[in-house]
A protein has these predicted regions:
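Terminal amphipathic alpha-helical/low-complexity segments used for targeting or macromolecular assembly
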Residues: 1-59
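Arg/Lys-rich RNA-binding interfaces used to dock onto structured RNA substrates
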Residues: 58, 62-67
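Flexible, glycine/small-residue-enriched loop-and-beta-strand segment within the central core
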Residues: 66-76, 81-147
Length: 147
């Protein structure tokens, strides 16, 4: 694991143009393309893609389209359901409990940027983890960030 990847996952300032991180994002994009373009009845294929993409997938069901940065920082509990257009920017870990339901258009962002313009212009970024407990339902089109 590169030092930049370690810092990213730990919530420290890191450089997102690190070669390993670029490759990880590309891998996720390929898997997401395959997932989002799968046939509506391809449940087994979708589950296999989620198992390859996510840190923990359980028996999740996610309606396409789904987007994330890396995938491996997303940990889903049992009986997770996300409706259309879910976005999880998983720069830091995202832990979601059991029996969680997300309505259409839910966005969960761990990524953020330094507030100081000099630091921000240097290209550094950081993130903070997000955790949702068990039995949560989130209505349509909210933006969840950890500030």
């Amino acid at each position: 694991m590169s030092e930049e990847k370690r810092k990213m996952i730990a919530g420290e300032l890191y450089r997102p143009n690190d070669p390993e991180l670029r490759e990880d994002r590309l891998r996720a994009r390929h898997l997401l393309h395959e997932y989002n373009h799968s046939a509506p009845d391809a449940k087994a294929q979708r589950q296999e893609i989620l198992k390859s993409l996510l840190g923990e997938a359980g028996n999740a069901y996610i309606e396409p389209t789904f987007r994330c940065d890396y995938g491996y920082n997303i940990y889903l509990g049992e009986n997770f359901y996300a409706n259309f257009d879910c976005v999880i920017l998983d720069v830091c870990p995202v832990h979601i409990g059991a029996n969680v339901m997300l309505a259409p258009g839910v966005h969960i962002y761990t990524a953020t940027h330094p507030l100081d313009p000099t630091e921000r212009n240097s290209g550094l970024e950081f993130a903070k983890p997000v955790t949702l407990g068990d039995n949560v339902w989130i209505g349509g089109a909210p933006l969840l960030i950890r500030a």
